[in-house]
Amino acid sequence: AIVEATDGSGPLLKLAEARAQALLGAESPSFSLLCLPPDKGSEDALFARLPRFDAVYTCGVLQHLSDHELYEGACFMERAVTDKGTLIVVVPLDHKGDPDRKTFLRDSLDYATLFERMGFRLASQEIRDGVGSPGHECR
């Protein structure tokens, strides 16, 4: 399997790469600096080097994107996943939005609607509280 790990922070990416090398050795994934939404050059370079993916996983990123950036990031993910692939999105729904700190409050329907309009189908949804217990969506 081809695994490509990405992060928008160079120092965090280097830390993750070092830990993966220590744990996995030769089986470690490749690592790329990639911000969402990616600039056109980064996106084209990534797709020139790698195939489309059977699964794309994003955790704790999308709530930091403005509406325009979220749309651009979603377009990138739609391009990155194969036609029968899976997109897994993890976002906190129970914190206050704060544009000054670059966090935007959206409910689960906002995310589901965006990705469904891009051709994805919602297969499953879980809403948990801040400690991981089954919870509810705060509005």
Residue ranges of model-derived segments:
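Short catalytic micro-motifs in class I SAM-dependent methyltransferases
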Residues: 60-64
